[in-house]
Curated annotation (Swiss-Prot):
Listed SUPFAM superfamilies: Actin-like ATPase domain
Recorded name of the encoding gene: tsaD
EC number(s) given by UniProt: 2.3.1.234
Family listed: Belongs to the KAE1 / TsaD family.
Gene3D superfamilies recorded: 3.30.420.40
Source species, domain of life: Bacteria
Keywords: Acyltransferase, Cytoplasm, Iron, Metal-binding, Transferase, tRNA processing
Ranges where the record places region Disordered: 333-356
Phylogenetic lineage: Bacteria, Pseudomonadati, Pseudomonadota, Alphaproteobacteria, Rhodobacterales
UniProt key word Iron: yes
Catalyzed reactions per annotation: L-threonylcarbamoyladenylate + adenosine(37) in tRNA = N(6)-L-threonylcarbamoyladenosine(37) in tRNA + AMP + H(+)
Protein name, as recorded: tRNA N6-adenosine threonylcarbamoyltransferase
Length: 356
């Protein structure tokens, strides 16, 4: 790694417009413009609205990141941009801006896989050495990866249907809670009894590291409908207990599947978690306890680097650029982009969902 590289990162793959400047692992600036209020009335991210908002905010985010870092564009060594996977309108907006900046300034360009940004985050936040085990858990993805290099990822398993973040979002919608669903369900669960509703733990009876979360959502829907039929509606305690039971089931699945992934990951330097769902306190604490039990160093990046941000894109671009990777002005935006092409595609693999 060349520590003196100064990298401008650009991220626009879902509903956060972000730009950041890194010099080595040092974050000189990180700007994020969210779209939560824009999509609140629709119960989820509307791709067309998200794309238009990115167009309005991308240049503002880049200007703010450069200003905060007290740098001009000609002082940047590399421009790193998310080129996929994601909602194609937003990804395309970011790629087009990055290509324009590169063409106008002569600054080299590197396209970054958004998932690689999450997977490499423990490298710049905690200096975690290769190889390590990564649980990438977000709105659109859930997979175990053995991370062996900036562009070397081996998938051990993943979700065969919904990602946990998507399940959280849909659960929030079913219970009349605001979006994004993860923080809303987590907040409700704090006042709930996780033992009142015992939801299924899918695929724990099967070997391997694959996961499934769609059945959990269906089980919660049936429990909700049963309460409504019996009592004419949901009480505040009903809602809290449903959230607590649902969250406990998600955590149990993630912890047990992580146990299996760790036991088959010889020679790793540690176990890391990243992605938006990694911001969930119960998920983080459950994984931390597991790592301590198995005597594996555990890394959970600061919350601001678990959710979508451009600092992780700048870092992933810096790692790839230092390893010799380059992109030209023919860089394409990609709605799907699996990290491990040697493995059969998971259902929906490589495409971002509601939030990642």
């Amino acid at each position: 790694m060349t520590p003196s590289l100064t990298v401008l990162g650009i991220e626009s793959s879902c509903d956060d417009t972000a730009a950041a400047v890194l010099r080595g692992p040092e974050v000189l600036s990180s700007v994020v413009y969210g779209q939560t209020a824009l999509h609140a009335a629709f119960g989820g991210v509307v791709p067309e609205l998200a794309a238009r908002a990115h167009v309005e905010k991308l240049d503002i985010a880049v200007a703010a990141a450069l200003s905060e870092a007290v740098l001009a564009l000609d002082q940047i060594d590399v421009i790193a941009v998310t080129a996929g996977p994601g909602l194609i309108g937003g990804v395309l907006s970011g790629v087009m801006l990055a290509k324009g900046l590169s063409a106008a300034s002569g600054v080299p360009l590197i396209g970054v896989n958004h998932l690689a940004g999450h997977a490499l985050t423990p490298r710049f936040t905690d200096g975690l050495a290769f190889p390590y085990l990564m649980l990438l858990v977000s709105g659109g993805h859930c997979q175990f990866l053995r991370v062996e290099g900036p562009e070397a990822f081996h998938r051990l398993g993943g979700t065969i249907d919904d990602a946990p973040g998507e399940a959280f979002d849909k659960t929030a919608k079913l219970l009349g809670l605001p979006q994004p669903g993860g923080p809303a369900v987590e907040a409700e669960a704090r006042a709930g009894d996780p033992a009142r509703f015992v939801f299924p733990r899918p695929l724990l009876d099967r070997a391997g590291c694959d996961m499934s979360f769609s059945g959990l959502k269906t089980a919660l829907l049936r429990a909700r409908d049963g309460l409504v039929s019996a009592g004419g509606g949901l009480t505040a305690q009903d809602r809290a207990d449903l959230c607590a039971g649902f969250q406990a089931a998600i955590c149990d699945v993630l912890v047990e599947k992580s146990r299996r992934a760790l036991t088959q990951s010889e020679g790793v330097t540690g176990f890391a978690v990243a992605g938006g769902v990694a911001a969930n306190e119960q998920v983080r604490s459950g994984l931390a306890r597991l790592a301590a039990e198995l005597d594996a160093p555990f890394v959970a990046p600061p919350l601001r680097y678990c959710t979508d941000n451009a600092a992780m894109i700048a870092w992933a671009g810096q790692e790839a650029f230092s390893a010799g990777a380059r992109s030209g002005l023919d860089l394409s935006a990609r709605p799907r982009w699996p990290l491990d092409n040697s493995q059969p595609a998971l259902l929906g693999s490589g495409k971002k969902g509601a939030k990642a």
